[in-house]
Amino acid sequence: MAIKPKYIKQLGNVLLERYPDSFNTDFETNKDSVTTLTTVESKGVRNRIAGYVTQKKAQAAQKA
């Protein structure tokens, strides 16, 4: 698994901190949330952010 770039992690963490209820463990809904909450125009960057957020939510759910 590749290491995510710093800007993906930073933006993903900011989104999780500000809007924790907008995200869950489903990639498709997280993709829509990233689209509505940010101004990211690139589909690839949007998907990477959504994937990172999905991964973080899944890890948090496993620990709980």
Curated annotation (Swiss-Prot):
Family: Belongs to the eukaryotic ribosomal protein eS17 family.
Alphabetized Gene3D superfamilies for the sequence: Ribosomal protein S17e-like
SUPFAM superfamilies documented for this protein: Rps17e-like
Annotated GO biological process: translation
UniProt keyword Ribosomal protein, yes or no: yes
GO cellular component: ribonucleoprotein complex; ribosome
Single GO term (MF): structural constituent of ribosome
UniProt entry tagged with the keyword Ribonucleoprotein: yes
Name the UniProt record assigns to this protein: Small ribosomal subunit protein eS17
Coiled coil: none
Entry superkingdom: Archaea
Entry keyword set: Ribonucleoprotein, Ribosomal protein
One matching Pfam family: Ribosomal_S17e
Gene that this sequence comes from: rps17e
InterPro entries: Ribosomal_eS17, Ribosomal_eS17_sf
NCBIfam families: PRK01151.1 (NF002242)
PANTHER family associated with the record: 40S RIBOSOMAL PROTEIN S17 (PTHR10732:SF0)
